[in-house]
Amino acid sequence: MLEQVRGPADLQHLSQSQLRDLAQEIRQFLIHKVAATGGHLGPNLGVVELTLALHRVFDSPHDPIIFDTGHQAYVHKMLTGRSEDFDTLRSKDGLSGYPSRSESDHDWVESSHASAALSYADGLAKAFELTGHRNRHVVAVVGDGALTGGMCWEALNNIATSRRPVVIVVNDNGRSYAPTIGGLAEHLAALRLQPGYERVLEEGRKAVRGVPLIGELCYQCIHSIKAGIKDAIAPQVMFTDLGIKYVGPIDGHDEHAVESALRHARGFNAPVIVHVVTRKGMGYAPAENDEADQMHACGVIDPETGLPTKASGTSWTSVFSDELISQAAKRRDVVAITAAMPGPTGLSAFRDRFPDRFFDVGIAEQHAMTSAAGLAMGGLHPVVAIYSTFLNRAFDQLMMDVALHKLPVTMVLDRAGITGPDGASHNGMWDLSILGIIPGIRVAAPRDGARLRAELGEALAVNDGPTAIRFPKGDVGEDIPAVQRRDGVDVLAVPATGLTHDVLLVAVGSFAKMALAVAELLRSQGIGVTVVDPRWVLPVPEALADLARDHKLVVTVEDNGLHGGIGSSVSAALRHAEIDVPCRDVGVPQQFQDHASRGEVLAEVGLTDRHIARQITGWVAAIGTRSAAEDEVGQTLD
């Protein structure tokens, strides 16, 4: 049946029985396709019936359907004519793992960072009103904890003041949403703080419990009824107090019920919340039984068991996780913060070992950073573990709430540099540029696991300002020893005997291995190369300037955007030190990179050992030619 669905129009004639069969077919399709490519499996298994209902009720793309977050959009892609492309999911030139405007008119937003859909919806609804398209609805599907982000509530505050037809579907899969909503609970909490409330409540408890034989039972019944009423109506009160109509809760796996609720909501022609309760990983036992995250995201797996098809090596994340626990065991002031990602950022083990010193703030990076500032003010040393790409969201808080106060907060930036399959929104290629303008910050880029352990300890020893440590996604590889240490800078290789000090090659973090390969290629061409790892890349170590004096050319290699990266900082440092040595930087072009494997993206932007060696060979030749020409001019003048 799925093969016959080329677009939403093909869903309109299906009976409820056929829709149930189609839902089952979609789940089997998802399991086998995502098992082969990797991707976000659990979230999409949970929204099958919901997505079917959305496309039967609303006229996409005339009525925009915006997914927050975009990793819930696989079924949407299938129902809009892209099923045949799923073998290429998250592959180079293939189907994106998120909505993609270049793929389909049905994808309005390339949404992958959470909590933004309602703001898009608010803007679109305003635009449709102003341009006379009042018959168009805007649908925002919010789930997977996105409502824990403050931006959602900022948008709701604006949406609620209008009569524009915005339908907000809350996909409540029990992953962070429910505990964050409860208007009546807040009112009751305020009431409990009023003088006399506790006294009257306690007298009432005593009176009921004092009834012979049945008193305690009566009290428990009344207490349960009160709690049930509070839980049942708290969501409605929260939203209706804002001025937004509320429909639900609805069984999200009953397509007919969801469709009826959506049609009802569509008829309001005003802002409305449709509360849909779903189960993440629905219909796939390995996902349903995965207590950690219902197989939120997976690599290549066996579809029958849900287990990875091949063992992975030691990851950067796991090295950080182990070392943080080791440090925390020695230092009671070390605390950890995550923005709804304890597993992916390596903090699950810390949470289990030190539950009182672990804080999951939800999808709230801004709050995470300023909360960390408060923890630091109180005498603790917070470690904020976050994906590099999500650091962008907390820039102001880092600048004004942490750095301005010179607070000892350590940020651990996972997935730094090119990550690959998740595409432009998840590449961590801006963090060095962002951090480079923060006064007083110290930034480390470890080249291997041993350096990650050492630099985490060094960061925790800093008590007069913020620190950051960045590392990439994937396996950490073998340790790379230094041949010598120069005032904190590790020298990894020196020119072979008989070669001059032609090039100082500055390797940033995990690019040290590639830099050594580049040096070997250049050695075979008679070019002498010194390879160094600054370890702490910001501020630029003074020893790096001293090393530069002895070379004809300085080249930096980094997996950050060229604009404002370490190359720019090194060039500025050499100018400041009045060292007149040419400096060239190699990094990621200042443009969004499409999804592909990390290796494919690096090759496409020229970040391979052979390409870099060719570049350096050309630069060295140009410097030699220029020097010869200058000598010739000098002789002529003499």
Curated annotation (Swiss-Prot):
It catalyses: D-glyceraldehyde 3-phosphate + pyruvate + H(+) = 1-deoxy-D-xylulose 5-phosphate + CO2. Pfam families: DXP_synthase_N, Transket_pyr, Transketolase_C. Binds 1 Mg(2+) ion per subunit. Its EC number is 2.2.1.7. Thiamine diphosphate binds at H71, S112, H113, A114, G145, A146, N173, Y284, E365. The keyword Nucleus does not apply. It is an enzyme of class 2 (transferase). Gene3D superfamilies: 3.40.50.920, 3.40.50.970. Mg(2+) binds at D144, N173. InterPro entries: Dxylulose-5-P_synthase (IPR005477), THDP-binding (IPR029061), Transketo_C/PFOR_II (IPR009014), Transketolase-like_Pyr-bd (IPR005475), Transketolase_BS (IPR020826), Transketolase_C (IPR033248), Transketolase_CS (IPR049557). Pathway: Metabolic intermediate biosynthesis; 1-deoxy-D-xylulose 5-phosphate biosynthesis; 1-deoxy-D-xylulose 5-phosphate from D-glyceraldehyde 3-phosphate and pyruvate: step 1/1. GO terms for molecular function: 1-deoxy-D-xylulose-5-phosphate synthase activity; magnesium ion binding; thiamine pyrophosphate binding. Keywords: Isoprene biosynthesis, Magnesium, Metal-binding, Thiamine biosynthesis, Thiamine pyrophosphate, Transferase. One of its GO terms (cellular component) is cytosol. The keyword Magnesium applies. Its cofactor is Mg(2+); thiamine diphosphate. One of its GO terms (biological process) is thiamine biosynthetic process. Catalyzes the acyloin condensation reaction between C atoms 2 and 3 of pyruvate and glyceraldehyde 3-phosphate to yield 1-deoxy-D-xylulose-5-phosphate (DXP). NCBIfam families: dxs, PRK05444.2-2. Homodimer. HAMAP family: DXP_synth. Belongs to the transketolase family. DXPS subfamily. This is 1-deoxy-D-xylulose-5-phosphate synthase. The lineage of its organism: Bacteria, Bacillati, Actinomycetota, Actinomycetes, Mycobacteriales. The gene is dxs.
